[in-house]
Amino acid sequence: MEPNQQRSCGSSSDSSATGTPQGSNVAVWRPWHDAPRTHVQNPPTAQQQFYSDNQSHMNDKGKPPSFQHPVKLFWPKSRCYDFMYQEAEELLRHFPVQATISLYQETDSDSDSEEEDIYEN
């Protein structure tokens, strides 16, 4: 490819649409987007090698091979303290990803009837 052709690839309308200066190929990283592919293949890190070696093992158990980020875990407000003390370790042991925990109000009438039984006795 000739040098003139390379310069014509990045037009001024392209640079104004992306908000990056002309001639810059730097993309803004967002954690919820897939990582951009590069032409240079870096050797895998120990952690990447571990996950790639165990990928088939994880798929055999029915777990998804990858997660779409951001991951949001929903937890009932009535069990908020349980989460903070006992069940948090178990949850994180079985779901080791970066996630946001969102508390929600339970609408199940079973939890309400249990509370009423305690006060009636």
Curated annotation (Swiss-Prot):
A motif (WRPW motif) lies at residues 29-32. Keywords: Developmental protein, Nucleus, Repressor, Transcription, Transcription regulation. GO terms for biological process: embryonic pattern specification; negative regulation of DNA-binding transcription factor activity; negative regulation of DNA-templated transcription; negative regulation of transcription by RNA polymerase II; somitogenesis. Its main location: nucleus. The keyword Transcription applies. InterPro entries: Ripply_fam. Residues 69-104 are annotated as: Ripply homology domain. It is found in: Nucleus. GO terms for cellular component: nucleus. Residues 39-57 have a biased composition (Polar residues). Residues 1-69 are annotated as: Disordered. Induction: By notch signaling. By tbx6 together with thy1 and tcf3. The ripply homology domain is required for transcriptional repression. The WRPW motif is required for binding to tle/groucho proteins and transcriptional repression. Required during somitogenesis to regulate somite differentiation and the positioning of the presomitic mesoderm-front. Represses the expression of genes involved in somite segmentation by acting with the corepressor tle4 to down-regulate the transcriptional activity of tbx6. Also regulates retinoic acid signaling during somitogenesis and is necessary for the expression of aldh1a2/raldh2. Belongs to the ripply family. This is Protein ripply2.1. The gene is ripply2.1.
